[in-house]
Amino acid sequence: MDPRARAVYRVDVRSFFDTDADGLGDINGVAAKIDYIKELGADTLMLSPVFSGEGFMIDTEAGTADDLDALIDKAASRMIGTVLEMRADMPLNDASDIDRASAAMRYWLDRGAMGIAVNTDALTASGDKRALHRAMCALNRNVFSLYPDCFTVGIGKNVPFEDAVQLTRTENRELLMQLYTPAHMAEAFSPASGSLGALFGGGDAKRFKHDADYYQVQGELKGGWFLNGISLTQGQFSSQQELTRRLRSKAACLYVMTGRGTPLIRQGDEIGLYAENTPMQWNNSRAAGFTLGTPRLKGDGSLSHINVEDDMTHMDSAFSFYKRSIALRRSHSALIGGEYAPVDSENPRVMAYTRSDGAESLLVVINITDRAAKVALTGYKKGECLLFTNSPKPIAESMKLQPYEGFVYRLR
Protein backbone atom coordinates (compact mmCIF):
# COMPACT_ATOMS: atom_id res chain seq x y z
CA MET A 1 0.00 0.00 0.00
CA ASP A 2 1.12 3.56 -0.73
CA PRO A 3 2.32 4.88 2.67
CA ARG A 4 0.66 8.20 1.88
CA ALA A 5 -2.71 6.44 1.88
CA ARG A 6 -2.36 4.95 5.35
CA ALA A 7 -4.08 6.13 8.54
CA VAL A 8 -1.79 5.79 11.57
CA TYR A 9 -3.09 5.16 15.10
CA ARG A 10 -0.44 5.83 17.74
CA VAL A 11 -0.76 3.94 21.04
CA ASP A 12 0.97 4.82 24.28
CA VAL A 13 1.23 1.26 25.57
CA ARG A 14 1.46 2.22 29.26
CA SER A 15 -1.85 4.11 29.17
CA PHE A 16 -3.92 2.10 26.66
CA PHE A 17 -5.23 -1.06 28.38
CA ASP A 18 -3.97 -3.13 31.32
CA THR A 19 -4.48 -6.92 31.21
CA ASP A 20 -2.50 -7.99 34.28
CA ALA A 21 -3.98 -5.54 36.83
CA ASP A 22 -0.64 -3.96 37.71
CA GLY A 23 -1.95 -0.48 36.92
CA LEU A 24 -0.01 0.01 33.69
CA GLY A 25 -1.02 -0.80 30.14
CA ASP A 26 0.81 -3.58 28.34
CA ILE A 27 1.37 -5.14 24.93
CA ASN A 28 -1.36 -7.71 25.54
CA GLY A 29 -3.72 -4.82 26.23
CA VAL A 30 -3.10 -3.45 22.75
CA ALA A 31 -3.76 -6.90 21.28
CA ALA A 32 -7.01 -7.13 23.26
CA LYS A 33 -8.21 -3.86 21.69
CA ILE A 34 -6.96 -4.40 18.14
CA ASP A 35 -10.51 -4.79 16.83
CA TYR A 36 -11.33 -1.33 18.19
CA ILE A 37 -8.51 0.13 16.09
CA LYS A 38 -9.80 -1.81 13.09
CA GLU A 39 -13.33 -0.50 13.70
CA LEU A 40 -12.03 3.07 13.69
CA GLY A 41 -10.54 2.48 10.25
CA ALA A 42 -6.82 2.82 10.98
CA ASP A 43 -4.56 0.44 9.04
CA THR A 44 -1.27 1.26 10.78
CA LEU A 45 -0.52 0.79 14.47
CA MET A 46 2.38 2.79 15.88
CA LEU A 47 3.54 1.61 19.31
CA SER A 48 5.28 3.81 21.85
CA PRO A 49 8.70 2.45 22.87
CA VAL A 50 8.44 -0.89 24.71
CA PHE A 51 12.14 -1.74 24.67
CA SER A 52 14.88 -1.92 27.25
CA GLY A 53 18.60 -1.82 26.57
CA GLU A 54 19.63 -1.57 22.94
CA GLY A 55 16.27 -2.48 21.44
CA PHE A 56 16.30 -6.28 21.40
CA MET A 57 14.70 -6.84 24.80
CA ILE A 58 11.19 -5.87 25.89
CA ASP A 59 10.62 -3.90 29.08
CA THR A 60 9.15 -6.46 31.49
CA GLU A 61 6.36 -4.08 32.57
CA ALA A 62 5.17 -3.97 28.95
CA GLY A 63 5.37 -7.71 28.29
CA THR A 64 7.59 -10.15 26.43
CA ALA A 65 8.95 -10.67 22.94
CA ASP A 66 6.34 -13.40 22.47
CA ASP A 67 3.63 -10.89 23.40
CA LEU A 68 4.90 -8.47 20.76
CA ASP A 69 5.09 -11.25 18.17
CA ALA A 70 1.48 -12.17 18.95
CA LEU A 71 0.36 -8.54 18.66
CA ILE A 72 2.11 -8.09 15.31
CA ASP A 73 0.50 -11.29 14.00
CA LYS A 74 -2.96 -10.39 15.31
CA ALA A 75 -2.77 -6.91 13.82
CA ALA A 76 -1.61 -8.34 10.47
CA SER A 77 -4.60 -10.70 10.44
CA ARG A 78 -6.77 -7.53 10.55
CA MET A 79 -4.73 -5.94 7.74
CA ILE A 80 -3.06 -3.59 10.22
CA GLY A 81 0.70 -3.06 9.97
CA THR A 82 2.72 -2.47 13.15
CA VAL A 83 5.33 0.28 13.38
CA LEU A 84 7.72 0.10 16.34
CA GLU A 85 8.97 3.33 17.87
CA MET A 86 12.56 3.08 19.04
CA ARG A 87 13.61 4.50 22.40
CA ALA A 88 14.17 8.26 22.38
CA ASP A 89 17.57 7.77 24.01
CA MET A 90 18.83 5.25 21.44
CA PRO A 91 22.30 6.61 20.56
CA LEU A 92 23.04 7.28 16.89
CA ASN A 93 26.20 9.31 17.29
CA ASP A 94 28.78 7.18 15.49
CA ALA A 95 29.19 4.11 13.29
CA SER A 96 29.13 1.64 16.18
CA ASP A 97 25.92 3.18 17.57
CA ILE A 98 24.30 2.98 14.16
CA ASP A 99 25.41 -0.63 13.68
CA ARG A 100 23.81 -1.64 17.01
CA ALA A 101 20.61 0.27 16.23
CA SER A 102 20.48 -1.24 12.74
CA ALA A 103 20.78 -4.76 14.14
CA ALA A 104 17.89 -4.15 16.56
CA MET A 105 15.68 -2.72 13.81
CA ARG A 106 16.39 -5.62 11.45
CA TYR A 107 15.64 -8.04 14.29
CA TRP A 108 12.08 -6.73 14.69
CA LEU A 109 11.44 -6.25 10.98
CA ASP A 110 12.43 -9.87 10.45
CA ARG A 111 9.91 -10.84 13.13
CA GLY A 112 7.08 -9.16 11.23
CA ALA A 113 7.05 -5.47 12.12
CA MET A 114 6.01 -3.31 9.15
CA GLY A 115 8.08 -0.29 10.04
CA ILE A 116 10.27 1.72 12.38
CA ALA A 117 9.86 5.13 13.99
CA VAL A 118 13.10 6.89 14.96
CA ASN A 119 13.44 9.82 17.35
CA THR A 120 15.15 12.65 15.49
CA ASP A 121 15.26 15.22 18.30
CA ALA A 122 18.47 14.04 19.98
CA LEU A 123 20.54 14.44 16.83
CA THR A 124 18.88 17.78 16.10
CA ALA A 125 19.78 19.02 19.59
CA SER A 126 23.47 18.39 18.91
CA GLY A 127 23.46 21.37 16.57
CA ASP A 128 25.14 19.39 13.79
CA LYS A 129 22.49 19.02 11.11
CA ARG A 130 24.79 16.87 9.04
CA ALA A 131 24.89 14.29 11.83
CA LEU A 132 21.12 13.87 11.61
CA HIS A 133 21.16 13.27 7.88
CA ARG A 134 24.25 11.03 8.02
CA ALA A 135 22.57 8.85 10.63
CA MET A 136 19.30 8.55 8.70
CA CYS A 137 21.14 7.78 5.45
CA ALA A 138 23.10 5.07 7.24
CA LEU A 139 19.93 3.54 8.72
CA ASN A 140 18.34 3.61 5.29
CA ARG A 141 21.35 1.89 3.77
CA ASN A 142 21.71 -0.67 6.58
CA VAL A 143 18.03 -1.36 7.24
CA PHE A 144 15.19 0.44 5.50
CA SER A 145 16.28 -0.17 1.91
CA LEU A 146 16.53 -3.92 2.61
CA TYR A 147 12.79 -4.12 3.31
CA PRO A 148 10.93 -2.79 0.23
CA ASP A 149 7.68 -1.98 2.06
CA CYS A 150 9.28 -0.68 5.26
CA PHE A 151 7.30 2.23 6.74
CA THR A 152 9.75 4.73 8.27
CA VAL A 153 9.01 7.91 10.17
CA GLY A 154 10.99 10.41 12.18
CA ILE A 155 9.53 11.49 15.52
CA GLY A 156 10.48 14.83 17.03
CA LYS A 157 9.27 18.35 17.71
CA ASN A 158 12.55 20.17 17.25
CA VAL A 159 13.52 19.33 13.68
CA PRO A 160 13.56 22.54 11.58
CA PHE A 161 11.19 22.61 8.63
CA GLU A 162 13.92 22.52 5.98
CA ASP A 163 15.50 19.48 7.62
CA ALA A 164 12.12 17.76 7.91
CA VAL A 165 11.71 18.22 4.16
CA GLN A 166 15.21 16.96 3.41
CA LEU A 167 14.70 13.90 5.60
CA THR A 168 11.75 12.84 3.46
CA ARG A 169 12.79 13.70 -0.08
CA THR A 170 12.83 10.39 -1.97
CA GLU A 171 16.15 11.02 -3.67
CA ASN A 172 17.89 11.60 -0.32
CA ARG A 173 17.13 8.03 0.80
CA GLU A 174 16.55 8.78 4.46
CA LEU A 175 12.94 8.44 5.76
CA LEU A 176 9.49 8.12 4.20
CA MET A 177 8.00 10.83 6.42
CA GLN A 178 8.64 13.04 9.44
CA LEU A 179 6.15 13.91 12.14
CA TYR A 180 6.25 17.68 11.84
CA THR A 181 4.05 19.74 14.13
CA PRO A 182 5.78 22.83 15.54
CA ALA A 183 5.00 23.40 19.21
CA HIS A 184 2.83 26.46 18.66
CA MET A 185 0.73 24.54 16.11
CA ALA A 186 0.45 21.50 18.36
CA GLU A 187 -0.88 23.72 21.14
CA ALA A 188 -3.23 25.69 18.93
CA PHE A 189 -6.19 23.43 19.58
CA SER A 190 -5.61 23.49 23.38
CA PRO A 191 -7.44 25.86 25.76
CA ALA A 192 -5.30 28.49 27.44
CA SER A 193 -5.71 28.44 31.24
CA GLY A 194 -8.90 26.44 30.84
CA SER A 195 -10.61 29.27 29.00
CA LEU A 196 -12.46 28.08 25.94
CA GLY A 197 -12.81 31.66 24.81
CA ALA A 198 -9.02 31.86 24.47
CA LEU A 199 -8.84 28.69 22.41
CA PHE A 200 -8.39 30.42 19.10
CA GLY A 201 -8.86 34.04 20.05
CA GLY A 202 -6.85 36.70 18.25
CA GLY A 203 -3.46 35.84 16.86
CA ASP A 204 -3.33 32.12 17.67
CA ALA A 205 -5.83 31.10 15.00
CA LYS A 206 -4.30 33.44 12.44
CA ARG A 207 -0.81 32.12 13.11
CA PHE A 208 -1.96 28.52 12.96
CA LYS A 209 -3.67 29.11 9.61
CA HIS A 210 -0.70 30.98 8.13
CA ASP A 211 1.82 28.37 9.21
CA ALA A 212 -0.36 25.40 8.27
CA ASP A 213 -0.81 26.77 4.76
CA TYR A 214 2.92 27.53 4.51
CA TYR A 215 4.03 24.05 5.58
CA GLN A 216 1.50 22.37 3.32
CA VAL A 217 2.39 24.39 0.22
CA GLN A 218 6.16 24.50 0.77
CA GLY A 219 6.30 20.84 1.76
CA GLU A 220 4.71 19.98 -1.56
CA LEU A 221 6.92 22.29 -3.60
CA LYS A 222 10.10 20.98 -1.98
CA GLY A 223 9.16 17.32 -2.15
CA GLY A 224 8.73 16.57 1.56
CA TRP A 225 6.11 14.35 3.18
CA PHE A 226 4.86 14.62 6.74
CA LEU A 227 2.99 12.55 9.26
CA ASN A 228 0.13 14.98 9.79
CA GLY A 229 -1.22 15.24 13.33
CA ILE A 230 -2.41 17.76 15.90
CA SER A 231 -1.82 16.99 19.57
CA LEU A 232 -5.07 17.80 21.34
CA THR A 233 -3.61 17.99 24.83
CA GLN A 234 -4.64 19.62 28.10
CA GLY A 235 -8.32 20.01 27.22
CA GLN A 236 -10.58 19.86 30.29
CA PHE A 237 -14.29 19.77 29.54
CA SER A 238 -17.26 19.41 31.87
CA SER A 239 -20.37 17.52 30.79
CA GLN A 240 -21.96 20.91 30.04
CA GLN A 241 -19.21 21.52 27.49
CA GLU A 242 -19.79 18.24 25.66
CA LEU A 243 -20.88 19.94 22.44
CA THR A 244 -17.72 22.09 22.36
CA ARG A 245 -15.53 19.03 22.91
CA ARG A 246 -17.23 17.13 20.13
CA LEU A 247 -17.14 19.98 17.62
CA ARG A 248 -13.52 20.84 18.37
CA SER A 249 -12.51 17.20 17.92
CA LYS A 250 -14.27 17.11 14.58
CA ALA A 251 -12.61 20.32 13.38
CA ALA A 252 -9.16 18.95 14.22
CA CYS A 253 -9.99 15.62 12.59
CA LEU A 254 -11.20 17.31 9.42
CA TYR A 255 -7.91 19.19 9.04
CA VAL A 256 -5.75 16.13 9.74
CA MET A 257 -7.67 13.90 7.33
CA THR A 258 -7.88 16.37 4.44
CA GLY A 259 -4.48 18.06 4.62
CA ARG A 260 -1.44 16.93 2.67
CA GLY A 261 0.35 14.21 4.62
CA THR A 262 -0.29 10.81 6.17
CA PRO A 263 -2.82 11.29 8.99
CA LEU A 264 -1.87 10.50 12.58
CA ILE A 265 -4.45 9.79 15.29
CA ARG A 266 -3.07 9.72 18.81
CA GLN A 267 -5.01 7.45 21.14
CA GLY A 268 -7.94 9.37 22.59
CA ASP A 269 -8.10 11.98 19.81
CA GLU A 270 -11.02 10.04 18.33
CA ILE A 271 -13.17 10.56 21.45
CA GLY A 272 -11.91 14.03 22.34
CA LEU A 273 -9.78 12.77 25.23
CA TYR A 274 -6.98 15.31 25.24
CA ALA A 275 -5.07 14.53 28.43
CA GLU A 276 -1.73 13.19 27.25
CA ASN A 277 -0.35 10.00 28.83
CA THR A 278 -3.42 9.40 30.98
CA PRO A 279 -5.35 6.10 30.94
CA MET A 280 -7.59 5.51 27.93
CA GLN A 281 -11.22 5.78 29.00
CA TRP A 282 -13.06 2.72 27.73
CA ASN A 283 -16.28 3.08 29.75
CA ASN A 284 -17.66 4.83 32.83
CA SER A 285 -16.89 2.01 35.26
CA ARG A 286 -14.21 2.08 37.94
CA ALA A 287 -10.85 3.20 36.50
CA ALA A 288 -12.63 3.86 33.18
CA GLY A 289 -12.29 0.20 32.21
CA PHE A 290 -8.52 0.67 31.87
CA THR A 291 -7.51 -1.78 34.61
CA LEU A 292 -8.89 -4.09 37.29
CA GLY A 293 -6.11 -2.84 39.55
CA THR A 294 -5.17 0.64 40.70
CA PRO A 295 -4.03 2.90 37.84
CA ARG A 296 -0.49 4.17 38.25
CA LEU A 297 -1.24 7.00 35.84
CA LYS A 298 -3.62 9.80 36.70
CA GLY A 299 -6.88 10.02 34.74
CA ASP A 300 -8.50 13.28 33.66
CA GLY A 301 -11.71 12.80 35.66
CA SER A 302 -14.12 12.99 32.73
CA LEU A 303 -14.97 9.29 32.37
CA SER A 304 -18.67 9.88 33.02
CA HIS A 305 -19.07 11.74 29.72
CA ILE A 306 -15.92 10.98 27.67
CA ASN A 307 -15.37 7.30 27.01
CA VAL A 308 -15.17 4.90 24.09
CA GLU A 309 -18.29 2.90 24.93
CA ASP A 310 -20.47 6.00 24.97
CA ASP A 311 -18.92 7.56 21.86
CA MET A 312 -19.32 4.39 19.80
CA THR A 313 -23.08 4.36 20.38
CA HIS A 314 -23.77 7.86 19.01
CA MET A 315 -23.83 8.66 15.31
CA ASP A 316 -22.92 12.30 15.99
CA SER A 317 -19.91 11.49 18.17
CA ALA A 318 -16.29 12.36 17.51
CA PHE A 319 -15.55 8.64 17.06
CA SER A 320 -18.18 8.32 14.33
CA PHE A 321 -16.82 11.41 12.59
CA TYR A 322 -13.29 10.00 12.65
CA LYS A 323 -14.59 6.79 11.05
CA ARG A 324 -16.33 8.71 8.28
CA SER A 325 -13.33 10.97 7.70
CA ILE A 326 -10.88 8.07 7.42
CA ALA A 327 -13.21 6.31 4.98
CA LEU A 328 -13.64 9.50 2.93
CA ARG A 329 -9.90 10.04 2.64
CA ARG A 330 -9.34 6.46 1.56
CA SER A 331 -11.93 6.76 -1.22
CA HIS A 332 -10.71 10.04 -2.75
CA SER A 333 -7.32 10.14 -4.44
CA ALA A 334 -7.20 13.95 -4.28
CA LEU A 335 -7.02 13.78 -0.48
CA ILE A 336 -4.00 11.47 -0.67
CA GLY A 337 -1.80 12.83 -3.43
CA GLY A 338 -3.62 15.91 -4.65
CA GLU A 339 -2.22 19.44 -4.79
CA TYR A 340 -2.98 21.70 -1.80
CA ALA A 341 -4.08 25.26 -2.66
CA PRO A 342 -5.24 27.81 -0.03
CA VAL A 343 -8.55 29.65 -0.51
CA ASP A 344 -9.42 33.00 1.17
CA SER A 345 -5.88 32.92 2.49
CA GLU A 346 -6.10 36.15 4.51
CA ASN A 347 -9.11 35.00 6.51
CA PRO A 348 -7.88 34.78 10.15
CA ARG A 349 -10.55 32.36 11.38
CA VAL A 350 -11.30 29.91 8.59
CA MET A 351 -9.05 27.28 7.03
CA ALA A 352 -10.13 26.86 3.40
CA TYR A 353 -8.25 24.99 0.69
CA THR A 354 -8.67 22.74 -2.31
CA ARG A 355 -7.13 19.32 -2.88
CA SER A 356 -6.93 18.48 -6.56
CA ASP A 357 -5.52 15.78 -8.80
CA GLY A 358 -6.33 14.74 -12.35
CA ALA A 359 -9.46 12.90 -11.27
CA GLU A 360 -11.26 15.39 -9.01
CA SER A 361 -11.11 18.58 -6.99
CA LEU A 362 -12.32 18.88 -3.39
CA LEU A 363 -12.89 22.02 -1.32
CA VAL A 364 -12.36 21.93 2.45
CA VAL A 365 -13.71 24.67 4.73
CA ILE A 366 -13.15 24.70 8.53
CA ASN A 367 -13.93 27.37 11.11
CA ILE A 368 -11.02 26.91 13.54
CA THR A 369 -12.43 29.25 16.21
CA ASP A 370 -15.09 29.15 18.91
CA ARG A 371 -17.02 31.98 17.25
CA ALA A 372 -19.13 32.22 14.12
CA ALA A 373 -17.06 33.24 11.09
CA LYS A 374 -17.55 34.12 7.43
CA VAL A 375 -15.53 32.81 4.51
CA ALA A 376 -15.31 34.07 0.93
CA LEU A 377 -15.42 31.25 -1.62
CA THR A 378 -15.39 33.40 -4.74
CA GLY A 379 -15.89 31.33 -7.87
CA TYR A 380 -17.05 28.23 -6.02
CA LYS A 381 -20.76 27.89 -6.72
CA LYS A 382 -21.41 24.21 -7.31
CA GLY A 383 -20.37 21.27 -5.24
CA GLU A 384 -21.59 18.12 -3.55
CA CYS A 385 -21.29 18.09 0.24
CA LEU A 386 -19.38 14.90 1.10
CA LEU A 387 -18.70 15.46 4.81
CA PHE A 388 -19.88 17.90 7.48
CA THR A 389 -19.29 18.41 11.19
CA ASN A 390 -22.79 19.65 12.09
CA SER A 391 -25.30 19.33 9.26
CA PRO A 392 -25.05 19.52 5.45
CA LYS A 393 -25.08 22.93 3.83
CA PRO A 394 -24.94 23.89 0.14
CA ILE A 395 -21.79 25.58 -1.10
CA ALA A 396 -22.00 29.35 -1.64
CA GLU A 397 -19.57 32.10 -2.60
CA SER A 398 -20.05 33.59 0.87
CA MET A 399 -20.71 31.28 3.81
CA LYS A 400 -21.25 31.83 7.52
CA LEU A 401 -19.85 29.02 9.64
CA GLN A 402 -20.78 28.17 13.20
CA PRO A 403 -17.97 27.57 15.75
CA TYR A 404 -15.74 24.68 14.61
CA GLU A 405 -18.06 23.97 11.69
CA GLY A 406 -16.51 22.35 8.64
CA PHE A 407 -17.34 20.82 5.27
CA VAL A 408 -15.80 18.88 2.41
CA TYR A 409 -17.27 19.54 -1.05
CA ARG A 410 -16.62 17.77 -4.33
CA LEU A 411 -16.47 20.58 -6.88
CA ARG A 412 -18.31 20.47 -10.18
Question: What are the residue ranges of the model-derived segments?
Answer:
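Active-site-proximal helices and loops of the catalytic beta/alpha 8
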Residues: 69-81, 117-218, 271-286, 356
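Beta-strand-rich binding/interaction modules
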Residues: 372-390
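C-terminal beta-strand-rich structural cap/linker in extracellular carbohydrate-active enzymes
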Residues: 395-412
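Surface-exposed loop/turn positions
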Residues: 150, 384, 403-405
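Loop/helix patches that line or flank the sugar-binding groove of alpha-linked glycan CAZymes
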Residues: 3-5, 203, 211-214, 220-229, ...
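Short catalytic/ligand-binding loop motif for oxyanion handling, primarily in non-cytosolic enzymes
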Residues: 17-19, 53-54, 90-92, 124-127, ...
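Acidic/aromatic-lined carbohydrate-recognition and catalytic surfaces
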Residues: 1-159
